[in-house]
Amino acid sequence: MSDMERTAVIVGAARLPTGRFLGGLSPLKAPELGARAIAGVVERSGVAPADIQDVIMGNVVQAGVGQAPARQAAIGAGLPAEIPAMTINKVCGSGLKAVMLSAQAIRAGDLQVAVAGGMESMSNAPYLVQGYRGGVKFGDRSMVDALIHDGLWCSFGRCHMGGHAEYTAWKADVSREDQDQFAYESHMKAVAAIDAGEFSAEIIPVEIAGRKGTTVVDT
């Protein structure tokens, strides 16, 4: 097989709107969000679902989402049940690692067509009560926030991941003022791009059914 035949290419790409914590997308768990993303990108790409050979999806905070999140997303998207699926947890790099693994498999000749991406719902991260399975014999027992414990807390440094970011900024001599200015400019560019409709082609609108009707989240 030639190098050209082993080249991995992206034939379709799409994303859901960017949500906020406890915002408009919060009624949907990560696999439900993933299902909508997969269904949308498959439709836009023109790839026949039966031609897809694997689904690889990144997902960090998996507590409470149910067994096999990537497979839930694939089935929820209407893909054939025969297609295997794998969930990847590489913290913030989970979704991109899923894409990398798919590309590696294609270059190796193991796959021809794959769906890859990431899905997350920080709003749906549960609170955990540890130690109750064996029973609490004496004293208090606190709840553990899975969002922090599984997603934002360094297992090795025993600190918030934001602390590592501050340390990295300090080592690179990036001031707080520089960070704030960069963040401000980034937000302003995003607002301008949204207003100009620059993101419309890549976003899959999400419909949320509620007591007051259906809400469409599209930015």
Residue positions per predicted region:
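Condensing-enzyme catalytic core mediating Claisen C-C bond formation in acyl metabolism
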Residues: 2-30, 40, 170
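N-terminal extracellular/periplasmic Venus flytrap/periplasmic-binding protein-like
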Residues: 14-16, 27-28, 33-36, 44, ...
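Short acidic, glycine/serine/threonine-rich loops at helix termini
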Residues: 21-23, 67-68, 124-130
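N-terminal beta-alpha supersecondary unit
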Residues: 21-47, 51-64
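Short, well-ordered amphipathic alpha-helical segments that serve as non-catalytic structural scaffolds
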Residues: 30-46, 69-73, 98-101, 161-168, ...
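Conserved catalytic cysteine-centered active-site region
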Residues: 59-114, 155-161
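Active-site-proximal alpha-helical scaffold in enzymes
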Residues: 90-120, 163, 169-198
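Flexible glycine-/small-residue-enriched beta->alpha junction loops
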Residues: 113-167
